[in-house]
């Protein structure tokens, strides 16, 4: 019997259309720079923003924290905007960080059904999320707006815990917040083999790879989940609840 279940956030609880938040950031920076009489070609901004993601991905794999502030400052440097007035630079950084607040992010299909089934079975529910360019405060806001935040007893966001999956410390943090069940009595649902599946399996949890939004392709040295789940409506039965 499972005592606790944790969920990844991106492409497991919520999803965005490909490039959606990237486009919102670019649009915001374009408006700010135009108003400051410092227009920058769109393609140059795209290249700089994509470079910030490359740096993030390197840090993520090395388990080094890399925040949206770091990324925004890198983009400023890539665009050679060092001489901007402080208030304009601050506006750019703020837009980069907070653009997700008003974004139309959507819960993954049937995730509400899965959360209710777990709650009805007496299972404690948590989140283990690797935060990218959108801070955890904003991610919680989307859960709240869609009426899902109350389903969770605890959350472990990397920008608050200070480490990314598959580091066992973030799994330890999550289970400690859920009453410290044995890992064998807990399951983790997520889409990525390297972080979600490998991290959960190495920690002794049941790993469920969710494919309803993104089906992470096989890669050498990366494990498969104990279960593969396409529809959240089937989660409770998959776990035998």
Residue positions per predicted region:
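N-terminal helical cap/lid subdomain that shapes the substrate entry/recognition surface
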Residues: 1-121
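Asp-based, Mg2+/Mn2+-dependent phosphohydrolase catalytic module
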Residues: 1-5, 15-19, 39-43, 106, ...
């Amino acid at each position: 019997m499972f005592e606790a279940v944790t969920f990844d956030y991106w492409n497991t609880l919520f999803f965005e259309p490909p490039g959606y938040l990237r486009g919102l950031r670019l649009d915001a920076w374009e408006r700010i720079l135009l108003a400051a009489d410092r227009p920058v070609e769109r393609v140059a901004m795209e290249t700089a923003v994509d470079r910030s993601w490359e740096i993030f991905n390197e840090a993520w794999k090395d388990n080094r924290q890399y925040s949206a502030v770091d990324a925004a400052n890198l983009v400023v440097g890539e665009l050679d905007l060092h001489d901007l007035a402080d208030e304009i630079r601050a506006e750019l950084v703020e837009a980069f960080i907070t653009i997700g607040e008003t974004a139309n992010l959507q819960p993954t299909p049937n995730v509400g059904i899965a959360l209710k089934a777990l709650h009805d079975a007496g299972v404690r529910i948590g989140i283990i999320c690797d935060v990218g360019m959108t801070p955890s405060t904003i991610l919680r806001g989307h859960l709240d707006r869609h009426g899902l935040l109350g389903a969770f007893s605890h959350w472990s966001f990397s920008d608050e815990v200070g480490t990314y999956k598959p580091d066992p410390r973030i799994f330890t943090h999550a289970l400690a917040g859920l009453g410290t069940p044995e890992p064998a009595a807990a399951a983790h649902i997520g889409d990525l083999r390297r972080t979600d599946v490998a991290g959960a399996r190495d920690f002794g949890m049941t790993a469920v790879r969710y494919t309803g939004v993104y089906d992470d392709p096989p890669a050498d040295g990366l494990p498969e989940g104990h279960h593969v789940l396409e529809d959240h409506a089937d989660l409770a039965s998959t776990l035998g609840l």
